[in-house]
């Protein structure tokens, strides 16, 4: 401010002086003119006797005084204003200085502007012939000056932008009470009833008519054991406590219910709806303080279902979905419980033997029997593999499908998961418009089936049997029936049929109709298949998507479930004759949670999922029977947990909890997305991570009872399972084995944090990188992606189809646009009145598919707004060969609070030039989490009509996507399956990197991310630019050849104050390779590592000048001077001093698998012991004396080198022991750091080593496992343990934290030794009677002798699960 002020003062004073002098000159000039004027001069002298007034002089003095006063006032005003301006404090960050080269550039540009102006004026001005030689000289001098002062235009740098407030901050308003005109009780009831699905306005108003207010004083009970369990209780104000009683009369609080939450058990609601209501057994609820409770009787639902029967199927389905996705998810997947969740002894129907029927027979149906074709067997979709679009049958889990026999010529349509063109909206017009249609979608039934069932024009081919049987599988046998039963063994079915067999089957069909309460038995016609499986056959495998109902006729089916963290299966229960199995998965549409295995020969009826839904469409009450059989199998412990575990919803922008809140529960994400943000002491907010479907949130704080460390808010509407702290304590007391599982979960979190915090540098320095991509990579575990075009020229339809084709190779993918939505849900689907129905349908699609793509419209339509609201991530798609622009839709997007992360995707033609000007694309946008360059096939840019485009991509979808294409790379990035390549430093030994790269390409392993240190950063940058090992080898060989030159290093020598060389020659060699390429313009995402000796920290470079940061990462101390960072002037050295193999950084950037190649030198560890002191003369003698024993003692240079690489060595050990890293080290120890002249030899060593390693990978299916979706694999598979042991995180500490239980005042007795899974009868067993002595096989005489041992084993398993009741039946702790 001072310099401009002085300049202004000088300018003002000089201007006044010029004015005064100018005025004086004018006066003199006037006087001179007066004197010389012929007429005026004489007239003046004649009249000189009369005096003339002195008015002009007085006027001048007055004007001068006025000017002086004005100037003085202005000066005083400026001084006062200057003194009043507060001095802003200097920022705490680094002070940027104006460097000398920047000054040179500034003045050089100034001179060039002057030169250009002079040149233009000289060229435009016409000159005479005499001045032409002079002008030529001037032009020549100007050209020389131009050459001397020629300054290239500086490339733009990426502007650092902070995330907008909408990304890091949650909404301040909590709840909708303040902004809604509805009463609080209506809002609370709407929130809790919404758990049962969306009810239309008439239905909801009908329910509200049955609401009852109930006021409670402190200590009053809402309900107690023995009272009816037939209501939903919603807390309007106050606080309720959910308790379980103990044998000593004391109660354990398992859950606190705050205003807005409810107390209910969906299984109890199901009992009331199905007509099997029972009183409370153990659960009670009391008021912790004066409270007001809303009570909604479950009978209100029955009245609603009477008026709207289609809603019955939908509500029961939602209850089943909650049971599987909430209760089982929390208790099995995270707490490791298995057979504790099921009741092992219920009384099924007694079918065989039956009075008056021969024991050797089993019911069959109809008079004709023939072997079914592949059309009758539903192809089961294998996880991680798209279904075969040709409709060919897929092999079973063990390659042995079960042999079905069609009992009649079926006419039901074929069920299959369709891989169809998303743009093909034909056949979708009859989409869901009712609650049953929503249930149909929820059950994941093919749309074509629904169309045919409802009389649509599209009909799937009917299952037409043929006379040619399929190849006989090992798990099934040909049915042979003869009159001598000993000849058939355990296979009672054969080609002979009789009237007696037909009558038996009719009886079995009646039993099935009775069990399912089917009023019209003809509904089973053409929908039932008879199967016989040999001993050991797997009927269905855990995780299967397309499942069926199995009704056991003869024998039994064993139900197994894989244990958590163990490669073992545990038997849950045994399905006896007369039982249904598979109802839960059929009703929910979720994958099967157990494996069905025929431990011995078994015969059963099978109803496919599509046939069962058609039966339900004809008679909706059938769903009640199926649901009741599921509830009958649940253990009383599950019923208790159904009360305690909540299913909650958080709206977009709302905070789940805030930093510093009390930790009283753990959350599991069911669908949606959450973001975790931490607020530092300075008030700055930082993004910690994002959480998607299946992630566990808040477990560390809840188990350690620490306040919440971060604020977690919803990026979009999110559903969660809530596990209260008291419930967790109750489970730990009852099943102590849960403590081991909790220790495993907690140790993973704590060890990850300790690995970040206990490095040689503080966490804030950037040295400690969290090992889990879920914590640091926001674009991981995505479920929904919105695609937004920059301009109308972007081929959106072709782009989305290409991306969907690539994603299909990873998992089921759905593409939605406004046309598809209107075709499937009707023209009014996007109206505001259909808000909840559309949200529910979209949530179902998210559950049914690995990822959902939302294609926005070209303008800001309601569908575009919906896409942005549903998205976990927004892809902004532009054309890389066009001028950087900001689209109109993007400009509208900038004005809205969009919380989803944004990524820029630039499309390039296959034959076009490489990416350029990426920085300009990024700078003109607000904060983007990343960018990608895609080289697209020619068909993407071809101009075709929609019909031709559809025809083209039908052919494309018939082929599997190329894993090396850029769209496959984008698909892996979006699904969290990125494969990273990390190259270590080691001088000339790094030439072997290229050989390993060549072998990697030949093995077919794609690379999505490249990083490196030192020579690894150089090779990695070449590969990220070229994407070809051959071209990388060619350019690296030329550079290595230049490194063997002797003259350039000699000319680069300098006085060794900082380094031996000036670095100029080395800079030129690197610049010749990369020119002025920016990191942002590389084809592959790239990073390298340097050591910042100014801040004593590790620096990770992901943007900026490529050659400078490669040079900085290769800067050896003592040889080359540190490189000044162009951004902040910090001094950068070789990254190998701190992290020579940065696999952990690649992991933090979202890599699922990291291939790390180490070429560093290995230090000698077998050093000599010389005592407490060391004499240099003694060492000299030992070295000079040829007969003396050699001693291994490091010299001063080696000691300094080892000290410099201490952190690097420790980091390398961490990388080697990590489970995500594939560590490779070629045999290059015989080569030295500067052996660049042996390039080809070192390359061959790396190539041969890579061929051997990757050949083994191919034989061991390692590559296929890398490409398998991380969410389709068993997440509970045991992994390699981290060898790092931190003194503050031992097993004892974790056990003490996790095992901590409430004081004995809240002790709860387990009742029986095995909990409720005892001989204490449940309500269902009471109904069935006390007879437990039935025959398991139904016909002991008909069983083959080979199954006797299996029967004994089965009985021993059941005997192990039985226990004698230790207390009266009334004390059994069931719900």
Curated annotation (Swiss-Prot):
Molecular-function annotations in GO: lysophospholipase activity
Region of interest: Disordered: 1-20, 352-436, 449-472, 1306-1375
Regulation acting on activity, per entry: Inhibited by a series a OPs such as mipafox (MPX), phenyl saligenin phosphate (PSP), phenyl dipentyl phosphinate (PDPP), diisopropyl fluorophosphate and paraoxon.
Main location: endoplasmic reticulum
EC supergroup of this enzyme: hydrolase
Keywords: Disease variant, Dwarfism, Endoplasmic reticulum, Glycoprotein, Hereditary spastic paraplegia, Hydrolase, Hypogonadotropic hypogonadism, Intellectual disability, Lipid degradation, Lipid metabolism, Membrane, Neurodegeneration, Phosphoprotein, Repeat, Retinitis pigmentosa, Transmembrane, Transmembrane helix
Phosphothreonine found at: 361, 464
Example GO BP: glycerophospholipid catabolic process
Binding-site positions, a nucleoside 3',5'-cyclic phosphate 3: 629-749
Effect ascribed to mutating residue 1362 to G: Found in a patient with Gordon-Holmes syndrome; uncertain significance
Miscellaneous: Its specific chemical modification by certain organophosphorus (OP) compounds leads to distal axonopathy.
Disease implication from the record: Spastic paraplegia 39, autosomal recessive: A form of spastic paraplegia, a neurodegenerative disorder characterized by a slow, gradual, progressive weakness and spasticity of the lower limbs. Rate of progression and the severity of symptoms are quite variable. Initial symptoms may include difficulty with balance, weakness and stiffness in the legs, muscle spasms, and dragging the toes when walking. In some forms of the disorder, bladder symptoms (such as incontinence) may appear, or the weakness and stiffness may spread to other parts of the body.
Protein name per its UniProtKB record: Patatin-like phospholipase domain-containing protein 6
Source organism (scientific name): Homo sapiens
Lineage: Eukaryota, Metazoa, Chordata, Craniata, Vertebrata
The encoding gene: PNPLA6
